[in-house]
Structures are given as structure tokens and as C-alpha cells.
Amino acid sequence: MAFLSLHTSPMEQPGAGDAGGMNVYVRALAMALAESGVEVEIFTRSTKAGQPAVEHPGPGVCVHNVMAGPRRKLPKEELPELLHHMVEEIDRIRLQQLHGRYDAIHSHYWVSGVAGLELSELWGVPLVHTMHTMAKVKNLVLESGERPEPRRREEGEQRIVDGAARLVANTPAEADELVSHYGADLDRIDVAPPGVDLKVFTPSFRRKSRSLRGVRPDSFHILFAGRIQRLKGPQVFVKAAGILRKRRPDIDLEMTILGSLSGAKDFNLQHFIEDAGLADVVTHRPPVVAPELASWFRSADVVVMPSFSESFGLVALEAQACGTPVVATNVGGLSRAISDGRTGILVDGHHPSDWADALEDLYDDVQTREDMGRLAATHAESFGWQRTAAITLESYREAVSGLLVPRR
């Protein structure tokens, strides 16, 4: 299999820049497929001087760092100009391989999908595509003053939907969005829920994790992990915590934010923190590797995901696997990742007072919080990556047997 993840590398640290759940998804899926006997070669754009041409994250998986454009990170909006160059370089790399061919292509995100259409036609092999996010869906939830996703992206995604042999969606809701917004054929969509690394994200003693992470033993610890951008909604959680603190000064509040700024540079989270009167209780840290992230999840009383749009929300699944309840927006894949009222709370909308209510309810009811944590860990056990790989592999087989290449 040839994987295309051109705008971001699966070797990048999630939570930094454009790296997020998709990076985890691409790498974990590739590793799980390799365990099933599928050789996976991932193509991504080289973004730093001295980067090796090939990296090996695990047996049966390699990552090709493709030379195209300057060896530095570029805004996603500039990458379409490099697509033809990347296609040429990927084909050159293919010709250097002993096997010289791939059975199919699996592209991730629209930039890779557009390149995938060209490579699919060039190689005579089918294209399987996963959107991860969709322009038309994101444009429905824009906040005032936010720049919409460009028409070029919408048109590119439409071409991908029309030309791919199969589409892999994270949830039934995402499949419905592909049909309603892009006119996708439901018979060509396979739903493969993402997984979680159940060897890393496991429950453990909260007090021990708090000691490791320097969290006070008896504080009410709220955690946000993700890219710092409006779409992920950290400003909603900060405003809600500010309301909660004014409402309940008796609560020993402690807040941790793990992640770095992504996208628009004018988004100033520190301004929201200071405006809410929370500067003395918020600790902002850079993103961390998976084992450390799991320890942070275990140290929290609740993990928050106030996203405006999520195709799935891997953070929610990882937190639950650690035995921590999640409060999240009732949107996209989060409504599937979380069992409302059992493993966490789904909040309709983004009104800070509604979020403050949810957090206050969990603070006041320790027993419910603990019960949710236990149920959350059990719930997450059904989301292993091998299940994702099995469904995705069947999608590849359907694509190859149909021998569908891009239709013009």
C-alpha cells in the first residue's frame, strides 16, 4: 500500500503545528496493517534540512520524506502549488523500489487526495481516501471573523469523492456528511472507527499520576490536550472555567493545557485566560509523547473537548482508555466516541455557562465521576487499531477487485 500524508508527517509530534489526530491515525493504522501482513509505504513532504530520505517507525512500515519545495514547514494553503512536483517525486521513488508497484493508494486529507487521483491514473491502481476533515462541514461552524475554507479545497474534495474507488469514513455521521454535502455514493463508503493504543493508554492510580505530573492531590484538575486554535474550542473551556470559579470559589481548581498554536496567529489564548481570571490556576505546556500524555490523562478529573468540528476525536478515546471521563461538544465523531451520561457528558453548543454546568455537576458528584471513569476505560477497549485495520483492509480489497481508477 502507498499511503499519502503530504501535508503532515506521521513522525511529527501530535498537538504541534498541523500535527494532530490524523498523524496518530496514519501511523497507527499503518502499523496495524503491517501486523496483518500488509506492507505500507507512507509518502510525506520533507520539511527540515538533514531529514533522512526514509524513516522506519516499525516493521513493515517506512516513511518516504519527499523533496518538493523548500525544506521547511509551509502553510497548507501553499501546498497545492507543489502537488505536481510531489507526484513526480513519488513516482521517481516508486521506480527505485524493488517491487516497483503498489496494489492501491490510501490518501489522507484533501491535498493528498488530489495527488492520489493523479497517481492512481498514472499507476493504474485504485485510490482509497479518508477525508479526516471536510471544507463544507468546517465552513458551517465558522465563528465571526474566521476565514472560510477556500473554494479550491471544496472543489478538490468534490473531485476526490467523484474519483476515488472507495471512501473510508470515521463514523456513520461522517459518511452521511459525504453523501449530503458531496453527493457520495453510500455503497462506496466504508466506516472504520479509529482506534486507540490500549498498551499505552491504560487506567492507573490517579494519585500516583498526579504525583508524577506535579498536580495537587485534592484539586479539581481539568485537562485540555490538542492544537491551540479556535476550531478546537479551548477558549470555550477557559470561559466556562472562569464562570465556574466565580460561581464556586470553594473549588480548588487546577487546569492544564497541552498543545501549541496552530493556524491563525491572531488567536491569543492567554488573553482569554487572563480575561477569565484564571492566570494563577492554568499551566500551559507543549505537546508531549503518548506515554506522558497518558499519564496526564490519568492525573485529570475530567478531560474537555469543546471542538466546533471533529471527524472523530482521538483525544476523547485516549482519555477514556485511561479511565478519565470526557466533557465534549455533541458534534461529529465525538457523539460516537463518548457514551453520553455513561463515560462522559456531551454538551449541545458552545455556551460557556452550559459547559460550566457540566463541569460543576462532575465536581459535585464524585461517585458519578468515578463510575464514568470505570465505564470509560471499558468503553475504549472496543476501539483497538486492529479492528480499524481489518475494516480498512476489506475496503482495499473491494477497491482492488473493482479496479476503479479516477473517473473523468
Curated annotation (Swiss-Prot):
One of its GO terms (biological process) is mycothiol biosynthetic process. Coiled coil: none annotated. Keywords: Glycosyltransferase, Magnesium, Metal-binding, Transferase. Its EC number is 2.4.1.250. GO terms for molecular function: acetylglucosaminyltransferase activity; D-inositol-3-phosphate glycosyltransferase activity; magnesium ion binding. Mg(2+) binds at F297, R298, A300, T324. Transmembrane segments: none annotated. It catalyses: 1D-myo-inositol 3-phosphate + UDP-N-acetyl-alpha-D-glucosamine = 1D-myo-inositol 2-acetamido-2-deoxy-alpha-D-glucopyranoside 3-phosphate + UDP + H(+). The keyword Glycosyltransferase applies. 1D-myo-inositol 3-phosphate binds at H7, D18, A19, G20, G21, M22, N23, K76, Y109, T133, R153. The keyword Nucleotide-binding does not apply. Homodimer. Belongs to the glycosyltransferase group 1 family. MshA subfamily. This is D-inositol 3-phosphate glycosyltransferase. It comes from Paenarthrobacter aurescens (strain TC1).
